[in-house]
């Protein structure tokens, strides 16, 4: 919305800067003066550059929104695999899903758990990353719509600060819920979430 508004403002500025042709003066001297003024060139380059810049920003914003709305499993894995601090990734399947929500009504269409190098994996129970769950690092849940992601985020909020039931940090990016382990510090959670967000938004 902001990029669209900024583009509209730039277009309006350019419209306001356009030279208007005045009514024909009655006096010859006034006609000569008006003619000289109209012959003077106007530099519209700054307005054109501003419009191009805002248009490019809008186009990029649209592309980014497409990336983070109902993302595919392969897209998420490809992006987060290179995030600093993530040591491994594993996607859930319908046969191997702790929550049993994959592809169900109201559930996620992609769910990728990841391990963090900041956490001692030997101290987290489970045979693989999915079994260890968010405790070993975190999870990326992709939903068909933003509304479904928000509903999931609200549900997770009910467990904030609930000790062993605390599900860690959870933030929305488009129709994605980015979760990080409760065993990480608040700063580590925030930094990891930021790095993941940047990778998911990156235009390649």
What are these regions (language model features)?
Residues 48, 73, 77-80, 150-153, ...:
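Extracytoplasmic/secreted envelope proteins and their assembly/folding machinery
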Residues 76-163:
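Short, solvent-exposed recognition patches
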Residues 45, 67-74, 183-190:
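Soluble non-cytosolic domains of exported or imported proteins
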Residues 19, 66, 79, 152, ...:
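Arginine residue identity/basic-tract feature
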Residues 63-83:
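Surface-exposed beta-loop interaction hotspot
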Residues 1-69:
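Amphipathic alpha-helical assembly segments used for oligomerization, scaffolding, or translocation
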């Amino acid at each position: 919305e902001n990029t669209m508004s900024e583009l509209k403002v730039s277009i309006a500025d350019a419209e306001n800067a356009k030279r208007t042709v005045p009514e024909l003066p009655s006096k010859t001297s006034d006609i000569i003066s008006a003619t000289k003024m109209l012959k003077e060139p106007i530099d519209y380059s700054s307005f054109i550059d501003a419009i191009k810049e805002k248009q490019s920003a809008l186009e990029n914003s649209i592309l980014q929104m497409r990336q983070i709305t109902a993302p595919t499993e392969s897209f998420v894995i490809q992006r987060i695999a290179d995030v600093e601090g993530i040591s491994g990734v594993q996607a859930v399947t319908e046969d191997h899903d702790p929550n049993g929500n994959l592809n169900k009504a109201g559930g996620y269409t992609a769910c990728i758990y990841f391990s963090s190098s900041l956490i001692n994996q030997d101290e987290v129970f489970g045979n693989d990353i999915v079994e260890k769950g968010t405790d070993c690092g975190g999870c990326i849940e992709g939903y068909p719509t933003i509304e479904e992601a928000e509903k999931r985020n609200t549900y997770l909020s009910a467990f904030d600060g609930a000790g062993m039931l605390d599900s860690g940090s959870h933030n929305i990016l488009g129709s994605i819920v980015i979760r990080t382990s409760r065993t990480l510090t608040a700063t580590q959670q925030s930094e990891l979430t930021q790095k993941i967000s940047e990778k998911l938004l990156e235009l390649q």
